[in-house]
């Protein structure tokens, strides 16, 4: 088994490669890591190729002898690059794979941005049969285009592909910093933009967290997945190619994160205060039943564990927080 990992230096890529290399199920597997902005070290089981998936020659070289592709490379809110990566890059990958004599399975890690994340009011849980509803911006649109391109290759060529649709992916202290009123906030909303500036500074100083509310003052439920659970789903997909072929799976926690429960738990366990913040966003519930049924996969990181892991995580001097992309 020879596995190409695009976006290999990201949080999912690095975790996935590490798990493959230590798993007894993949002891004969080798990795080709396609890197762009950052780099990895080559080993006897990892070959590193530097370049862009938008370049056909780079893709052709990276896919030589490949049996499986784990496609993680993506763009956030970068209009100048998003179509090169999302459309052109994915097209070259799919074209080269379908003509390859060694290729067996293509795994796309998509995003629930293709379903609107928490921008739209879905009256029922979001399943894999619901139509695409991208929220404003080029990133969400790119997630729709990825899924549609893979789906059409499955129709056109009976292409052996699987889409794993993930919501916001957490690792290390990501969740803690997603609740910061400071300029160090991870992702969105940017909480300090939703309150008075002086209040935001005081909340940040005190360690107070936001309790996100919808337009009716009800705590919002928002979908997340821990990187460990996503990696497990990726490996389950490789090991279960028959039920996975041609399918899309929601890969997420069993229940969305309830910001009301987050506030209660952090107050109870760490005496952390919260302040309600009214927003334009909506509660959603991403349904992962299909992945449980067909892949025999189940997430292990619960709400309380997600919180505890994030607050307990200690960074050393070589592990500074850095955001590699806008959006």
Q: What residue ranges belong to the model's regions?
A:
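NAD(P)H-binding glycine-rich loop region in Rossmannoid oxidoreductase-like domains
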Residues: 40-42, 50-88
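Catalytic helix-loop patch of NAD(P)-dependent Rossmann-fold dehydrogenases
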Residues: 121-163
